[in-house]
Amino acid sequence: MERAAKKEAVDALKGTFQSTGVAIVAHYSGLTVAQMQTLRTQMKQAGASVKVSKNRLAKIALEGTDVASIGSLLKGPTVIATSNDPVAAPKIAVEFAKTNEQFVILGGAMGTTVLNPDAVKALASLPSLDELRAKIIGLLVAPATKIAQLTNAPAAKVARVVQAYASKGEAA
């Protein structure tokens, strides 16, 4: 790899690391090309990405970023999964590791917080940001719906009483 190509690779990685919410590092030795392609596809669908690069270049790119702490995990054949959603990359990585023994999660970082493999698994068990937003909106909308039902209930009762008198008057 020429010096200019290395500089370009480092700059691209640095941009990725600076804009990511979470980074997960895993060993991928022994995975087939098809398995790696499956991982890339799943990550892309979840809004995450997977990068395989030379460890030395990745360590240089990590310098000065929030996730610089993962540099110590870069030993051997490693893959780095990143996403803006703090749950997307860990969730896909943990699910993929369950079905592929060769894929071993080493750890990661969420901002400046270092994550060990157990913390990555715990993070993966959390609902995504979109799911949390939906729950919050549901909680906010529920009281408004109940208030609307309560304010409409007296009017409905009055209408039923009037209807009952009208029916009684017709019957007489």
UniProtKB/Swiss-Prot annotation:
InterPro entries: Ribosomal_uL10 (IPR001790), Ribosomal_uL10-like_sf (IPR043141), Ribosomal_uL10_bac (IPR022973), Ribosomal_uL10_bac_type (IPR047865), Ribosomal_uL10_CS_bac (IPR002363). One of its GO terms (molecular function) is structural constituent of ribosome. Keywords: Ribonucleoprotein, Ribosomal protein, RNA-binding, rRNA-binding. Pfam families: Ribosomal_L10 (PF00466). GO terms for cellular component: large ribosomal subunit. The keyword Lipoprotein does not apply. GO terms for biological process: translation. The keyword Ribonucleoprotein applies. Part of the ribosomal stalk of the 50S ribosomal subunit. The N-terminus interacts with L11 and the large rRNA to form the base of the stalk. The C-terminus forms an elongated spine to which L12 dimers bind in a sequential fashion forming a multimeric L10(L12)X complex. Forms part of the ribosomal stalk, playing a central role in the interaction of the ribosome with GTP-bound translation factors. Belongs to the universal ribosomal protein uL10 family. This is Large ribosomal subunit protein uL10. The gene is rplJ.
